[in-house]
């Protein structure tokens, strides 16, 4: 039986700022609150668990959504403090914020935009796993063709990369589900599962917001393509396919505990 690790980088929406649009935290939070609730609706309808990597900003400005995430059985992990301006001190501060808001211990970290992190600092602060690696070659973003494809240890911290296909290392993250034909994406996921025994992917709340209805965001086509309710449907069909094939959905912390036994 193979394992599915769904994850969501639960951050304030800031993509328009990358394209020169002045965008406030309040506006970004509105988009991300709605998107996160839509994600939770899909997960609840399918009865599956996931891991939500939350920024400190999101946790402090959407405590009611954080509560829903926990009430519905999902794991909360850390994703920095301010998604737009990550800092070296975020490892400790984001953990403090998220644990204060949730009242629960946090075990995992993912750096905004999957940028590199200090493994010694991750360990020092008390995280047991780090999921900040996309082992693919995407010019201008990720240059990790020689990095391990599957989980590995660095000291006491388990590294859990996002899944890429065997051999050619095609990334199986959010943009791929937006833009590939669904049948091809599902085929690549199943091939990866047969090879690795588990599958890790990640999405963002703002993908589930109706981006096409907001030209003022100046979003590139590959990002707004199949966004909003179309993305809800794509996620729903992906989950149903994976369940029908007998896979088990688990949180990252549960996966770490299982692997370490």
Feature map (PLM): residue ranges:
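Conserved, mostly hydrophobic/aromatic
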Residues: 9, 43, 79, 109, ...
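The substrate-binding groove and active-site-proximal loops of carbohydrate-active enzymes
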Residues: 24-30, 54-55, 80-85, 106-107, ...
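Active-site beta->alpha N-cap acidic-glycine motif
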Residues: 1-72
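Active-site-adjacent pocket scaffolds in enzyme catalytic domains
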Residues: 16, 99-100, 104-202
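Short catalytic/ligand-binding loop motif for oxyanion handling, primarily in non-cytosolic enzymes
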Residues: 14-16, 60-62, 85, 116-120, ...
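Generic structural signal for well-ordered alpha-helices
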Residues: 36-40, 63-67, 91-95, 119, ...
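Metal-dependent polysaccharide deacetylase catalytic core of the NodB/CE4 family, i.e.
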Residues: 46-118, 127-128, 132-133, 158, ...
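C-terminal domain-boundary segment and adjacent tail
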Residues: 44-47, 182-261
């Amino acid at each position: 039986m193979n394992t599915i690790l769904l994850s969501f980088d639960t951050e304030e929406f800031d993509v328009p700022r990358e394209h020169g649009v002045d965008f406030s935290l309040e506006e970004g939070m509105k988009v991300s609150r709605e998107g996160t609730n839509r994600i939770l609706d899909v997960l609840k309808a399918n009865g599956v668990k996931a891991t939500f990597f939350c920024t400190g900003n999101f946790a402090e400005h959407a405590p009611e959504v954080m509560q829903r995430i926990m009430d519905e059985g999902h794991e909360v992990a850390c994703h920095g403090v301010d998604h737009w301006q990550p800092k070296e001190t975020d490892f400790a501060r984001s953990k403090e914020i998220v644990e204060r808001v949730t009242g629960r211990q946090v075990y995992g970290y993912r750096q905004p935009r999957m940028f590199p992190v200090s493994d010694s600092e991750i360990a020092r602060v008390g995280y047991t796993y780090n999921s900040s690696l996309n082992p693919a070659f995407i010019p201008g973003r990720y240059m990790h063709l020689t990095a391990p494809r599957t989980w590995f240890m660095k000291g006491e911290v388990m590294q859990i990369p996002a899944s890429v296909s065997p051999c050619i290392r095609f990334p199986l993250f959010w943009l791929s589900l937006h833009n590939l034909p669904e049948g091809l994406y599902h085929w690549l996921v199943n091939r990866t599962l047969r090879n690795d025994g588990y599958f890790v992917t990640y999405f963002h709340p703002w993908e589930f917001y109706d981006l096409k209805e907001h030209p003022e965001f100046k979003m590139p086509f590959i990002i707004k393509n199949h966004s909003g309710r179309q993305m809800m449907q794509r996620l729903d069909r992906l989950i149903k396919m994976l369940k029908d094939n007998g896979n088990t959905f688990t949180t990252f912390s549960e996966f770490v505990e299982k692997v370490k036994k």
